[in-house]
């Protein structure tokens, strides 16, 4: 029992000692904390002073830094713009080069196409020329050319020139026919059409009186009215007589007149002189492939002799102008009229029916009597 009580007392003392120690420790820690606070406060004041100085220095350096930064930004922007411009120029040059290349290629293709077309056209022309040459050599073509020339001569004579539909079934027809002078008598032919299938004498124009196209009339007049044409005249008062001195002037005048009519594409020319007894010279020209044939017509014998002497001069002068003389014919006016009348008779025989054949095929009197029976027709030919 006593032992336990002793231990408790000891423990109580020990506990009291411990409490004293704790109080001492608490006091020591508080003192230390206060000391530390003082130190920290002093250091904080120093730090604040240092920070304020640094802030002032930094505030001074801020505008210089901003200036530097703005300059750097401007420099960078300029470099960017320069780079962009160079890039754009480079791209534009590339595009321009590409376009030029494309154009050149197109031009080359176009030139090739043109060259090919020209080759094809030249080949076709050569083929056509070869065929045409072969065709020219053929005798049928030669005959066709002869027929064309004959038809052109026939057109120059103009047998059907005075024919017009206006003259048919008109009261003033006869007055118009009288004004058109002709070498032949005005022979009018009525051509009546039959129904050859039925072999009946019924006339087409009896059934349809209003249709004038079923009846055709032809008037044979050999020449056009020469008053309408403009004949070239050269009057020279100096050329009075056929003297030897004035022969050169005569020759030059005739040569000039022939060349002038050829250049104007006229087939006729006329030269009249001041002395009336010499008369005038009528010239007819025919041109074929730069080859000329001249027909002189005059009634005076001295003029004919002079024209015969002019032949070598005319040949030389026309050769200088690129024209060759095939023939030169000298006629009287009476011979030319007879020659023309013979030609006209031949052409009329070729283009109209003969008298016997006309009587066999068409009984004109019978048809005429049948026309009289119909009272609807007012005029008869």
From Swiss-Prot:
Pfam families: Flg_hook (PF02120). The keyword S-adenosyl-L-methionine does not apply. One of its GO terms (cellular component) is bacterial-type flagellum hook. One of its GO terms (biological process) is bacterial-type flagellum assembly. CDD domains: T3SS_Flik_C. It comes from the Bacteria. The keyword Cell division does not apply. Keywords: Bacterial flagellum biogenesis. Two-domain protein with the central portion of the sequence acting as a hinge or connector between the two. Belongs to the FliK family. PANTHER family: FLAGELLAR HOOK-LENGTH CONTROL PROTEIN. Controls the length of the flagellar hook. This is Flagellar hook-length control protein. The lineage of its organism: Bacteria, Pseudomonadati, Pseudomonadota, Gammaproteobacteria, Enterobacterales.
